[in-house]
């Protein structure tokens, strides 16, 4: 079985790193049928259309809206592989996705093995990521059930999404925050969500182009509670654990924050969301007013 596999890359404010990522995609042993990039304004995608036939489109702002625009632009695709604009996949990433998702039609979401993730630190340089990829020896057989896909690298079966009318939830504005988990849990009602070790890569975790700490902090509280309240497979206990873990990190580091994380802004956002919760006016969209 040959699948039609399209890569979709949502991007904002990081055109130089996007171009590096597109160049890296030329090394895939199984070429994508199409590569589509979605920005929110022309400056997001400068130079992208010149690289390996990448197609470029613009959508309204917000990661879920961009993801939905990418899906809408690929009506013929069986699978869409979402990469962040700063994720460098192993050359056999798409081949591994096709092997497993063609071989097992019950897989509706597949996420890869992140060999190194710069999101928890200052971020990684492209040459560091390439060094990690050169020495990686992922297991060709490792496929395990997992709770959700990780948005920086996740493959979704679009045929299943279309059949059941599923989309990313655009009530989660800006950076999305948990939009990947929400969609994974809704798709889990119709099949398997797995992690495929052979589909590996490195997430640079570039800090440029990310949102304000206050807004992100608000979303860290508001989004999980909103998703749990939908009753669509996102458990309340998971939401509470997620909020507790993030708030604890923000409190611990607020006095001496890492230079690359706005901990005080995030903590302020956490507290604003809790205050709104008490007043019964907490909704994900409120971040747009902050």
What are these regions (language model features)?
Residues 149, 153-156, 160-165, 170-199:
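A short, conserved alpha-helix in the catalytic core of glycosyltransferases
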Residues 23-32:
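Short, acidic, metal-binding catalytic loop of nucleotide-sugar glycosyltransferases
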Residues 92-125:
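Conserved donor NDP-sugar-binding/catalytic core segment of glycosyltransferases
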């Amino acid at each position: 079985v040959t699948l039609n596999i399209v890569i979709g890359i949502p991007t904002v404010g990081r055109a130089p790193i996007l171009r590096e990522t597109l160049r890296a995609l030329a090394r895939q042993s199984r070429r994508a049928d199409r590569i589509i990039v979605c920005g929110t304004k022309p400056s997001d995608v400068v130079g992208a259309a010149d690289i390996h036939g990448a197609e470029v489109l613009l959508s309204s702002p917000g990661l879920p809206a961009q993801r939905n625009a990418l899906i809408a632009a690929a009506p013929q695709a069986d699978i869409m592989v979402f990469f962040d604009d700063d994720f460098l996949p192993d050359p056999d990433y798409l081949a591994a996705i096709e092997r497993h998702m063609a071989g097992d039609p019950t897989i509706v979401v597949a996420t890869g093995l992140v060999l190194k993730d710069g999101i928890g630190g200052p971020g990684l340089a492209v040459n560091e990521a390439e060094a990690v990829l050169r020495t990686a020896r992922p297991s060709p057989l490792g496929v395990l059930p997992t709770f959700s896909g990780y948005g920086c690298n996740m493959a979704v079966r679009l045929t299943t999404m279309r059949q059941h009318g599923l989309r990313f939830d655009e009530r989660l504005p800006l950076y999305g925050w948990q939009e990947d988990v929400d969609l994974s849990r809704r798709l889990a009602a119709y099949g398997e969500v797995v992690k495929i070790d052979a589909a590996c890569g490195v997430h640079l975790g570039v800090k440029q182009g990310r949102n304000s700490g206050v807004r992100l902090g608000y979303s860290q509280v508001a989004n999980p509670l909103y998703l749990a309240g939908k009753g669509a497979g996102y458990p309340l206990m998971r939401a509470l654990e997620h909020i507790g873990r993030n708030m604890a990190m923000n409190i611990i580091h607020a006095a001496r924050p890492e230079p690359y994380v706005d901990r005080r802004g995030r903590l302020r956002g956490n507290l604003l969301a809790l205050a709104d919760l008490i007043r019964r006016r907490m909704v994900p969209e409120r971040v747009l007013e902050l």
